[in-house]
Design a protein with these regions (language model features):
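Active-site regions of metal-assisted phosphoester/phosphodiester hydrolases
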Residues: 1-32, 37, 45-56, 60-70, ...
Length: 302
C-alpha cells in the first residue's frame, strides 16, 4: 500500500516573501493532490487571521492541517499573564493583542520581502554584525518575525486518521501516529538547530528517546535537519538503521540548500522499520519558492 510523503522548509526569513508565497501555494496545490502527508518547516502562521489567508492551498477539502508555533509556550505565557491580570477582560484583550500582532505581521513581511536574504547572509557569515543589528536597530522586527514562525503538518484526511501533536526538545517538533496497511506508523516533522551540529544532535537524541516510548512498527523522520552527510546527526541515524530515501534510491545524497547552486544536503526523509520499500524519492522546488529544495517520496508499506 503506497504512502506518499513530502517535506519542505518554506523560510519566511527570506527575500521576496509576497512573490514567493504565491509560488509556494501553486506548488502545494498540486502536491496536496498527490501526497498523503506534507510536513512544512518555517511556515508562516498568523495569530488571528485564518492560516488559509496566507496558504490558500489549505482550503482543499481533501486535507486537514495542524500548525504549531515555534514559540507557542512563550505566546501562551503572555496570554495567560493577561488572563491573570485582567480575568474579566481576557477574551477582549487577547483579541486586541492578536489583532495588533497581525498588523505588525504586515511590517515584518515587508521587511523580509525586501531585506530577507541580506539578513540571512549576515546571520551565517557575520554573526557578530547580525547580533548587533538584532539587538539595536531592528529588535522588534526580528522578535515579531519569530512569533509568526512555526511548523505545519498537512494530512489527507480521507486516507489517514490521526491527531498531530507537538513536543519541545530545545526546539519543537511535530509527531503523529496512525495505522497504514495494518502497520503502526510514527511520523515526526523535524527542524533541528542550525547554530551548531552539537545542538542539533542533542535535539535529535531527545526526539529518538521520545519515539522509543511510543509503540510503532515504522518510524519516519522528515524535515530540515540542518545536518550534512558528515555531521553527527547523519552518522547517528545511519548507524542506527535509519535509511535516507534519497540516498537509497539515488546511491548518493542530493544537495538541498541553498536552492540556487546547492552546497549541502540538509533536508531528508529518514525511515526505519521492516516491510517498507522505497518506490521513488526526489527533490523539488527552486529559488522562486524558498531557499530550500524539498524532498518527497513514495513508500510501499507491505
Amino acid at each position: 500500500m503506497k504512502l506518499k510523503i513530502l517535506t519542505w522548509n518554506l523560510n519566511f526569513f527570506y527575500d521576496n516573501w509576497y512573490d514567493r508565497i504565491k509560488s509556494i501555494n501553486k506548488v502545494l496545490e498540486k502536491e496536496i493532490e498527490n501526497n498523503d502527508i506534507i510536513v512544512l518547516q518555517e511556515a508562516t502562521i498568523p495569530l488571528l487571521k485564518s492560516i488559509d489567508t496566507i496558504f490558500g492551498c489549505l482550503k482543499s477539502p481533501l486535507i486537514s492541517y495542524t500548525p504549531h508555533y515555534t514559540f507557542s509556550d512563550e505566546i501562551k505565557t503572555v496570554f495567560d499573564k493577561i488572563a491573570t491580570i485582567f480575568p474579566k477582560k481576557k477574551q477582549q484583550l487577547t483579541y486586541v493583542l492578536k489583532f495588533i500582532m497581525d498588523k505588525i505581521f504586515g511590517v515584518v513581511s515587508w521587511t523580509f520581502y525586501n531585506f530577507g536574504s541580506s539578513f540571512q547572509y549576515l546571520y551565517f557569515n557575520y554573526p557578530l554584525v547580525w547580533g548587533c543589528l538584532f539587538m539595536t536597530l531592528l529588535p522588534l522586527i526580528f522578535v515579531c518575525g519569530y512569533c509568526f514562525l512555526g511548523m505545519m503538518c498537512v494530512v489527507n484526511k480521507n486516507k489517514i486518521k490521526t491527531v498531530v501533536k507537538s513536543k519541545f526538545v530545545g526546539r519543537p517538533f511535530q509527531y503523529c501516529q496512525f495505522k497504514f496497511n495494518n502497520k503502526r506508523i510514527l511520523l515526526c516533522n523535524i527542524h533541528l538547530n542550525e547554530a551548531s551540529d552539537t545542538k542539533g544532535f542533542k535535539e535529535l537524541k531527545k526526539i529518538i528517546s521520545f519515539t522509543n516510548k511510543i509503540p510503532h512498527d515504522i518510524l519516519i523522520l522528515a524535515g530540515d535537519f540542518n545536518s550534512s552527510p558528515k555531521s553527527s546527526v547523519y552518522n547517528y541515524l545511519t548507524n542506527n538503521s535509519f535509511k535516507s530515501v534519497i540516498k537509497e534510491k539515488h546511491d548518493k545524497d542530493i544537495k538541498t540548500w541553498p536552492a540556487i547552486n546547492p552546497k549541502s544536503c540538509i533536508d531528508y526523509i529518514w525511515i526505519k522499520g521492516e516491510d517498507v520499500k522505497i518506490c521513488s524519492a526526489n527533490i523539488f522546488g527552486n529559488a522562486l519558492n524558498t531557499d530550500h529544495k524539498g524532498v518527497k517520496c513514495c513508500l510501499d508499506i507491505k
